[in-house]
Design a protein with these regions (language model features):
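Acidic (Asp/Glu)-rich catalytic clusters
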Residues: 27, 52-59, 89-96, 132-136
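Extracellular carbohydrate recognition and processing domains
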Residues: 279-304
Length: 335
């Protein structure tokens, strides 16, 4: 195999090499489709006058672009990737070449892009965001060149991956695939399709009101839609305006270990009729994934099966490090 970059534009020598290999492949296996999977989507110069011209010279059937999220090409890779997928889709609409996404399922045990550093499983929350970004842009198919040993069936007799966490990634992926309610709600937040069914208003500081404005942030600690909490105990009170049947609460948080940003260990939900006396309704552990040396991703905590009649809801947590939260969904539904 030969790996090359399509950045800043597809070099002429690379185009000629691809076409020569394609011709050879067709001579050996007539009638079969040809696929290439270059890296460099994050560093491509889409506005260069020759970018699309070089792409149009390629005589392949499929280009499966490495999304480079695992390789961490940017400090915050996903926000730019979302835009780049859209730009690449626009180009492919004028080409006779299928556009696939090659989603990187891994992160690095030590240094990034270092052959001495092992590839280990990424959190499924991050991978789902990659799937969503590619799907929204209209890719024709999503694949991954890293599955075995990264996404590991716990029932397999031959365990090749990182103990525990490769199984965790597999279980979460299969839960999403089978329509698990948490993963479908979380996916809807990534698609910006989750809404509050209950009419709610935040009580307290002005910046707390952003937690019920329906605006979700991206995987970037500088995004102004994140509400920032420092170390310590925090309580957020929500007025539902009237006595309401409370079924579930979903809280979104950011994970970015390099800036000491993470989820609280537990989330507590209390209810009250008068806003003075509160009763504990539920406690839920936040998700934990240890392979976080380099990655940025969004997580969520779902507190469901509440079955409470209440007007006021208090969400409480202890922050062992900085907690960034963008939205608290009360009785969330998918639009």
């Amino acid at each position: 195999p030969v790996e090359d970059c399509l950045c800043p534009i597809f070099a002429e020598h690379a185009v000629q090499s691809v076409n020569a290999l394609t011709e050879k492949a067709h001579s050996l296996t007539p009638g079969k489709k040809t696929l290439i999977s270059p890296y460099g989507i994050g560093l491509s110069e889409f506005d260069h006058p020759d970018f699309e011209k070089q792409m149009a010279k390629l005589k392949v059937d499929i280009i499966a672009y490495q999304d480079e999220v695992g390789c961490v090409r940017d400090k915050f890779t996903l926000p730019r990737l979302k835009k780049n997928w859209q730009r690449m889709r626009d180009i492919h609409n004028r080409l006779n070449i299928e556009m696939w996404a090659n989603c990187e399922t891994f992160t690095w045990e030590e240094g990034t892009n270092d052959r001495q550093s092992a590839l280990i499983p990424a959190a499924y929350s991050r991978l789902l965001s990659q799937q969503v970004a590619a799907s929204v842009a209209g890719v024709d198919k999503i694949i991954s060149f890293m599955f075995g040993g990264i996404i590991e069936d716990p029932k397999s007799a031959y365990q090749l991956g990182q103990p525990v966490w490769s199984n965790n990634l597999y279980n979460n992926y299969m839960a999403w695939k089978e329509g698990d309610s948490f993963w479908k709600l979380f996916e809807a937040t990534l698609l910006d399709k989750l809404v509050n069914s209950a009419k709610s208003e935040m009580i307290g500081k002005v910046d707390m009101k952003a937690l019920a404005d329906g605006r979700v942030a991206e995987e970037d600690s500088g995004d102004s839609r994140w509400v920032r909490f420092e170390k310590g105990h925090h309580e957020v009170v929500i007025d539902l305006q009237k006595n309401t049947s409370l079924q579930k609460v979903l809280v979104r948080t950011l994970n970015y270990n390099q800036e000491k940003i993470g989820a609280p260990l537990k989330v507590y939900v209390y209810t009250s009729q008068d806003g003075q006396t509160y009763n504990l309704a539920s406690i839920k552990d936040a998700p934990y994934f240890p392979n976080n040396k380099h990655d940025t991703w969004i997580d969520a905590v779902l507190i469901d099966n509440l079955k409470e009649k209440t007007r006021y809801v208090k969400v409480a947590f202890d922050a062992l490090e900085n907690v960034y939260m963008d939205e608290i969904f009360v009785n969330p539904s998918i639009r």
